[in-house]
Amino acid sequence: MAEFTSAEKVNIGYENEYSTDAMTGGPDKRRQLYYQLIRSMKKVESVDIIVSFLMESGVRMLLKELEHTLKRGAKIRILTGNYLGITQPSALYLIKRKLGDRVDLRFYCEKGRSFHPKSYIFHYTDYSELYIGSSNI
């Protein structure tokens, strides 16, 4: 398997090149997680979102693209939890109200165990993308 430094670009046969750099925000959209998530959803066949917290504001930011992704026939699975009591019930209700059963929404709740992942996995025909890090929705 090839190894890349953080400054190298990887061309994986998609419209644009992807950087293996960390996404930190700033004025360059390519370094913003939000931009990458939206871009990745445009041609995905399925997406798995695994985050410890869901906030209504974050769901609202992604809602239109989630709707478009579903309309194209892609599958969306979301796994979240109530670790530290931070997930907002209004975020869960918003997903169910707007996207209904078209989204597989699951809730991890095991007393005494932490649940703190932040992963976005995009599955395409020939490859998958994975974003991991510190951003919740």
Predicted regions mapped to residue ranges:
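PLD/PLD-like phosphodiesterase catalytic module centered on the HKD motif
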Residues: 1-137
